[in-house]
């Protein structure tokens, strides 16, 4: 089992390090199997020096607009946290600001001395004081670190799968984000068959093929987590 987990970690690390991924990575497995735990507590720490992971739970999200707003909010939270918690000097902080254009100037205008902890707290506060919808275009890299979007609970979203996967594909294909989708695919197919018939399941599979570059099955021994 350890070998399987290590192999899975290697495959996911390879995907996250691809220069130009052709699609998303789908990690599927049964509920309670440890998929999210694996990504958050194994993969993320393993790549902490080169990647920033942004996890968005799709549970309870009812529209594409709500999802897009949630992604922007999570992006700002992660970047603000990165700036506030990193041991970076003023020069390094300036490089981050350059990457955070066009709202960097609005932040700088409100900052105090950024070389002290209070200044770093000011960075986070300033980021949250800005209207993300109006001023921000999220980027797939920040200060040399690759951003990985993690969409969790695919099967628990209220958004029709066609719209949902189409939205995710926008980040994958057009904005070139490394993207991990965590799902219980058996539940998705069962639900589609029960409520919409086989044609809808086929539709899900067809759309998935356009969005997903590779699919990995997660089978974990509870004793391993």
Would you name each region that the model predicts?
Residues 24, 29-30, 36-40, 46-144, ...:
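P-loop NTPase nucleotide-binding core
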Residues 1-8, 34-35, 63-68, 157-161, ...:
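Phosphate/oxyanion-binding active-site loops and adjacent basic polyanion-contact surfaces
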Residues 45-47, 204-210:
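Short, conserved catalytic or adaptor-binding loops enriched in Gly and charged residues
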Residues 13, 43, 68, 72, ...:
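Short, well-ordered alpha-helical packing segments
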Residues 1-22:
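Pre-Walker A adenine-sensing motif
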Residues 22, 32-33, 60-63, 184-189, ...:
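Conserved nucleotide-binding/hydrolysis micro-motifs of P-loop NTPases
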Residues 210-225:
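Conserved small helical "lid"/interfacial subdomain of P-loop NTPases
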Residues 133-186, 190, 194-196, 200:
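Conserved Walker B catalytic segment
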